[in-house]
Swiss-Prot record:
It catalyses: beta-maltose(in) = beta-maltose(out). Belongs to the porin LamB (TC 1.B.3) family. It comes from Hahella chejuensis (strain KCTC 2396). One of its GO terms (molecular function) is maltose transporting porin activity. Induction: By maltose. Gene3D superfamilies: Porin, LamB type. It is found in: Cell outer membrane. It is a multi-pass membrane protein. GO terms for biological process: monoatomic ion transport. This is Maltoporin.
Length: 398
């Protein structure tokens, strides 16, 4: 063996020893597989199944694609109260048109949604908190039967969450969900108000402009989003009352079912608010109900552009057994967008078979018929103002 090879050996040996030692001293867990999926087949009284604005009137019988999220995570280190976990997720979507659908076209896509490390117990001043970095679904708030994420600042980022702070827990994060828009997210949660729990949050978003963008006069005004959510346990379920107020790039999402992401279509002179009341309750042994009501207002003084909307929807379920139920989903939406009216309503009936009696039990297979009507326009195939859809869909999460 030459001296050169000896030097290589001595350089590699300590690394190999360290890796081997770590394998024997770290208690790593098994890989966890989590995910979400929906898929099916449908048609309408005028060709293919036609779907529109499910965030306004409901998603049951109003989803025309195959969509899935596949998540892998593993705790790689667990010692002395300190843990490190890595998580990665891919999502994919296809048009549900046929057998072979390559995920490389404009309509069929695959995306990296999560890739992060979460470390707990490593902060001396807050051992209960989690330190994290990477792409992450971050503390998302959603209404399931609408597929509406009304508070969501997910994306690449870093932060600390779950710091014990008086009556609640404090979290802070830096994320980016849109281009060069940096978001600072601050939340204080778990504040007890009688039997209810209050969470408040403030999001600050500001573009990070290049010199060329500055020279071109691009706007970089600070946008703010304030959110308050009061959660109350009722009727073997819960009710949530949400208030949101946004300015600048956070104003426009208040009128179009946006979440916590900055909207570049409006970057100065705007303000808006949104009220949401939603929940899932169990009024009797065989009946469960998911419901939502929303009202939003948007104003743009610079552009003299004002709009408002309201939406109401409900999905009651009657359980015939622990594994079979009947759904009725109804939804109504109306808006006035700077003098232009829009209106949409939907009614869906479905027979479903689920893996258990709970409203949240999945997997589930459902057969549905859905009628959607546009009261002001003709958005459907052939210039029609309404459509009747039929189909079968599965939904699962694990």
């Amino acid at each position: 063996m030459t001296d050169k090879n000896n030097k290589r050996l001595f350089k590699v040996a300590p690394l190999a020893t360290a890796i081997a030692a770590s394998l024997f001293t770290v208690n790593a867990s098994a890989v966890e597989w989590h995910g979400y999926a929906r898929s099916g087949i449908g048609m309408s009284d005028n060709g293919d199944q036609q779907c529109i604005n499910k965030q306004a009137v409901g998603r049951l019988g109003n989803e025309c694609e195959t969509y899935a999220e596949l998540d892998l995570q593993q705790e790689l280190f667990n010692r002395d109260g300190k843990t490190f976990k890595v998580e990665t997720m891919l999502s994919y979507k296809s048009n549900q048109d046929g057998d072979y659908e390559a995920l490389n076209s404009e309509d069929d896509e695959i995306a990296l949604r999560q890739m992060n490390v979460q470390a707990k117990g490593v902060l001396g001043f807050a051992p209960e908190a989690t330190l994290w970095a990477g792409k992450r679904y971050y503390q998302r708030h959603d209404i399931h039967h609408l597929d509406l994420f009304y508070w969501d600042v997910s994306g690449p980022g870093a932060g600390i969450e779950g710091i014990d702070a008086g009556a609640g827990k404090f979290s802070a994060a830096w994320t980016r969900g849109y281009g060069n828009i940096n978001i600072l997210d601050f939340r204080y949660s778990g504040i007890q108000v009688g039997a209810s729990s209050l969470e408040v949050g403030l999001d600050l978003a500001k573009p990070r402009l290049t010199d060329a963008q500055k020279d071109a006069g691009a706007a970089d005004d600070l946008s703010t989003l304030f959110t308050a959510e009061l959660s109350t346990p009722i009727m073997d379920g819960f009710n949530k009352i949400v208030f949101q107020y946004g300015t600048e790039g956070y104003a426009s999402p208040m009128r179009n079912f946006g979440g916590g992401q900055w909207n570049g279509t409006l970057d100065k002179g705007g303000k808006g608010f949104r009220l949401i009341d939603w929940g899932v309750v169990k009024p009797s042994a065989n009946i469960e109900l998911s419901y939502a009501a929303m009202y939003g207002v948007f104003e743009d003084d610079d552009m003299n552009d004002d709009s408002s909307f309201y939406s109401i929807s409900a999905r009651p379920a009657y359980k015939w057994s622990d594994y079979m139920r009947t759904y009725l989903e109804v939804g109504y939406f109306a808006a006035d967008d700077d003098g232009v009216d829009s209106q949409l309503d939907k009614i869906t009936i479905a027979q479903a078979w689920s893996a258990g009696p709970s409203f949240w039990a999945r997997p589930e297979i459902r057969v549905f018929a859905s009628y959607i009507n546009d009261g002001e326009g003709t958005p459907f195939e052939g210039g029609e103002d309404s459509v009747l859809n039929f189909g079968v869909q599965m939904e699962a999460w694990w």
